[in-house]
A protein has these predicted regions:
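Non-catalytic, mobile gating and regulatory segments of ester bond hydrolases
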Residues: 1-115, 119-167
Length: 167
């Protein structure tokens, strides 16, 4: 896979990692890259846009699903997310976390940027929330052709008011 993103003055190509998975008898894959930008001391997490017929099936898998439970400000939080992107995120979550952790161990003073457009914007939003709650780091989130992966009034209110992403 080949794509371009522009971050401030930086222009680079993406060589996406692809993880295949099956859902209800159909084949899918999630495409992403976790990289380190030495010039800016920045970890970048990048999710590919909608690029195939199977990606469109993911986009139209609307029913909500329950997301991981976690504690925030002493309260147990249970978010609802778009089923297609939620399933896709769960497929790559541990790999993305491992890659981020390895880069944070090497570069503890770095900051994190998360990018995505179209389908990738839903993935990027889920990843940004996950990074904050897993690592305690507020990532910078950049989405293009953005979607809304979080469902429900309570979930929306939490996501909008939580201090998890740099504005």
């Amino acid at each position: 896979m080949y794509n371009h993103f522009k971050s401030y003055h930086l222009f680079f190509s993406c060589d996406y990692e692809s993880i295949p998975y099956e859902f209800k008898g159909k084949q899918y894959c999630v495409d992403f890259q976790v990289r380190f930008d030495e010039a800016r001391n920045c970890i970048q997490v990048i999710f590919e846009q909608t690029s195939s017929k199977s990606d469109w099936r993911v986009n139209f898998n609307f029913p909500s699903k329950l997301y991981d439970k976690f504690t925030f400000d002493g309260k147990l939080i249970q978010l609802k997310v778009h089923r297609g992107w939620g399933n896709m995120w769960l497929v790559c979550q541990s790999t993305v976390r491992q890659k981020i952790k390895a880069l944070l161990d090497e570069h503890p003073d770095s900051f994190i940027e998360v990018f995505g457009w179209s389908l990738g914007s839903g993935m990027a939003q889920l990843a940004a929330e996950d990074i904050y709650f897993k690592f305690g780091i507020k990532p910078y989130l950049y989405t293009y052709g953005s979607v809304k992966p979080f469902y429900g009034k309570d979930t929306y209110n939490f996501v909008v008011t939580a201090p998890s992403i740099h504005g």
